[in-house]
Structure formats: structure tokens, C-alpha cells
Amino acid sequence: MEIIKKLWGHEEIIINRQYCGKKLVLNKGFRCSMHYHKKKDETFYIVKGRVLMEVDGKKKIMLPGDSQHIAPGSKHRFTGLEDSEIIEFSTHHEEEDSYRIEESGKVNLKDIEA
């Protein structure tokens, strides 16, 4: 298994062949970049914590057991409202297919949850 450190936590890549499986560990008060993929089709499943998911301008708080499908071309990001774990199921991941609009970083949760 490959572990990739990120500003917001880390990714544990379980498999990345014709399909991809990852465990995402998201730290409280951090978010990934706002981005989209031209090819990648993904589904996120919340295992632990509370996550603010933003998809194409719509916001939703996700809890353990919730899932969210992200179609190719959909702009998305997630924010850790608590320390969280997310399982990602997707088509093959290629870093060249990630188009970032806003960078990842630390956020003030008071601004988000107000």
C-alpha cells in the first residue's frame, strides 16, 4: 500500500489499476483543493467523522454511512469538520487528470459552520 501525505491529511492507495480504491484520512479544520477530473468517476463513502462535501456549488454535511457520487467534470472538495476517514472508489486515478481551481489548506470552521 502506498501512503501519500497531503496538507489536509493523507491518502492510502489500496489499489490503482483499472479501478482505484483509497482510504482518505482528513484532519479536522482542513480541506482538499477545489478540483475536477475530466475522466475520473468517483464515489466517496464516509467511515468516520463529519465531512462538508461541496459538489458543483452545493454543500452537504456527510456522516458515517453516507456516500456521494462525483461524475467526471463535477467541481468538488471536502472539508474535515472532525477528524474523518473516507473510502474512495473510482476509475483509475491519474494525477494529470486533476484540475485544481483552489488550493487545499486550513480553514476556520467557525466560518463554515456559522
What kind of feature is each model-predicted range?
Residues 23, 43, 58-60:
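Short, surface-exposed secondary-structure edge patches
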Residues 33, 53-55, 88:
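Short hydrophobic/aromatic-rich beta-strand segments that constitute the beta-sheet cores
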Residues 56-75:
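Short acidic-glycine-tyrosine-enriched beta hairpin
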Residues 1-34, 40:
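A short glycine-rich, His/Asp/Glu-containing loop-to-beta-strand
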Residues 3-4, 77, 81-114:
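Double-stranded beta-helix
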Residues 39-51, 56:
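Glycine- and acidic-residue-biased ligand/ion/polar-headgroup-sensing regions
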